[in-house]
Amino acid sequence: IVLVHGVGLNHKIWEPQIDAFDNSVLAYDILGHGKTPLNKDNISFDNFSNQLINLIDELKMKKIHLIGFSIGSLIARNFASKFNDRLESLTLLCSIFNRTKKQQQIVKDRFELAKKSKSLSKQALKRWFTDDYLEKNPNTYNKISSILEQNNMENFLKVYELFVNHKDNEKFENIKTKTLVMTGEGDIGSTPEMSENLSKVINNSKVKIIPKGK
């Protein structure tokens, strides 16, 4: 199992999942996050796919179960469209697709705010988790807040801009592995409707919507 985190985060967000799985699990820092440098000004999702294929080749992993969250799901989509033969399965968590002009503008406004403030708003946690969950899991709030605060803002903005401008231009017809598309019932950024529509363009896929989830 290979886990790909979201923008502004790092591999440590997957610690509960690593503890839960009996399988061998790999969680890594994507380019420009955690301890992984980003040495390019012009980046694309191909760079992230190349990072992943080089990593699993180095570790001699022939086939993997790939799970991506948020921008990690876009990396996973790109990877699957290019290296489908290396996948046993694909899971796309909270994956944007076919955003409306209004949805696109909200993300652009958030990006502009991040550029001006030079910091990551903890409001992101309000988007990612319900109030009830954060109240019951204060350690999660503190842990992810700490990760957000440690970001290299220059690198973060480069990667975030890639997410903001994404146009769903993957070759979905190349994705033939069994795929699960998941999001939360209350996710306003990657909505249930997006997941339903994404599943329609990926053969051999199904959708799971988490009740009361964000």
Which role fits each region the language model picked out?
Residues I1-D41, L55:
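Conserved HGGG/HGGXW glycine-rich cap/lid loop of the alpha/beta-hydrolase fold
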Residues D29, H65, E88-T91, E173:
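Residue in the alpha/beta-hydrolase core beta-strand immediately N-terminal to the catalytic nucleophile
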Residues D46-I64:
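Conserved acidic catalytic loop of the alpha/beta-hydrolase fold
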Residues G68-G72, A76:
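Gly/Ala-rich beta-loop-alpha elbow adjacent to hydrolase catalytic centers
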Residues R77-K82, L87-K118, W128:
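Flexible "cap/lid" loop of the alpha/beta hydrolase fold
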Residues K101-Q105, K118-E173:
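Conserved alpha/beta-hydrolase catalytic His-Asp/Glu region
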Residues I175, V181-T183, D187:
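Short beta-strand/loop motif that positions the catalytic acidic residue
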Residues P192-K214:
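Catalytic histidine neighborhood in serine/cysteine hydrolases
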